A protein has these predicted regions:
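N-terminal, positively charged/glycine-rich alpha-helical extensions of SAM-dependent methyltransferases
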Residues: 2-44
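Conserved alpha-helix/loop element of class I SAM-dependent methyltransferases that forms part
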Residues: 50-71, 87
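Class I SAM-dependent methyltransferase SAM/SAH-binding core
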Residues: 81-133
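A conserved beta-strand element that flanks and buttresses the S-adenosyl-L-methionine
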Residues: 145-146
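A short, conserved alpha-helix within the catalytic core of class I
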Residues: 153-166
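Short glycine-dipeptide loop
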Residues: 171-177
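Conserved class I S-adenosyl-L-methionine
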Residues: 178-201
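Short alpha-helix
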Residues: 204-221
Length: 265
């Protein structure tokens, strides 16, 4: 782990290996296994690392350009096997100082394996920790970035709130959070769950409307510098079982992703 990141931690890792700090956070992570690893190793990680997907969308390109223009070290949250915005930042600014993080140790280990074996990359560190328990000191991180990192947080609305408050706590005064998050039509989702007999997802409650990301960001204290539609579509069978059930019932579930530049007040 290189500077400045190694100076930001408030407590030692559970273990250190090959320059990576591990904080034993797999319980809060997406569930990946060896079948996923086989897909990643078949070329998926290489395609993800060299993808121009975010560079070709005006909303996400605005985030990437802003990260580079700001110039400060940036921490990618919940990077997953796509590594979020970091590959795009590295394509345009190879020397930019970045830390990619995820709660899943397998994701981090596989990124380390891929990068060491296939790329000549500098100023890109890796760490494992949960967004709901970020091991950084207060007011230390100048910039975070993410792609549906908050949207995929476990434990429903409670998990979203905990993760967002951790990001806000650890950002420096006037620090930035560049993120793309997804909102889904919860009323339509609940209708599909009822009519299909499927068990509703944890944290999805019919008597409490799900807040928008704008509402969540403002509640925590962020200033919304910019908000742009990244993608607007309908959930399909290719997404998951809920999308399949929705198609069979003829119910459209709106999925809207927006790109935000947020600043800590």
């Amino acid at each position: 782990m290189n500077k400045p990141f190694c100076d930001w931690f408030s407590r030692p890792p559970v273990r250190r290996y090959d320059g990576i700090y591990y904080y034993d956070s797999d319980r809060d992570a997406d569930c990946f296994d060896e079948s996923d690893v086989a897909i990643w190793r078949s070329g998926r990680m290489k395609r993800n690392f060299h993808s121009d997907f975010f560079l070709n969308n005006p909303a996400s390109r605005r985030l990437v350009d802003a990260i580079i223009a700001q110039g400060d070290p940036v921490v990618e949250i919940a990077c997953g096997p796509g590594m979020g915005l970091m590959p795009s930042v590295k394509q345009l600014a190879p020397d930019h100082v970045c830390l990619a993080t995820d709660a899943n140790s397998l994701v981090i280990e596989e990124w380390k394996r891929y990068l060491d074996g296939n790329e000549t990359i500098k100023n890109l560190d890796l760490a494992q920790f949960s967004l709901m328990d970020i091991p950084f000191r207060d007011n230390t991180v100048p910039a975070y970035s993410g792609y549906i990192g908050l949207s995929s947080t476990r434990n429903g609305e409670e998990g979203h709130e905990r993760a967002l408050r951790e990001i806000y706590r650890t950002l420096t005064e006037n620090g930035f959070f560049y993120t793309i998050e997804t909102w889904m039509d919860t009323e339509a989702m609940l209708r599909v769950f009822r009519e299909s007999g499927m068990t509703p997802w944890s944290g999805l409650e019919s008597d409490h409307p799900t807040p928008t990301w704008r509402e969540r960001f403002l509640q925590v204290g962020f200033e919304i510098v910019s908000e742009d539609v990244f993608e607007s579509r309908t959930l399909t069978a290719d997404d998951n079982e809920l999308g399949e059930a929705a198609e069979q019932l003829g119910i459209g579930i709106s999925v809207i992703s927006k790109a935000y530049i947020l600043q800590k007040n």
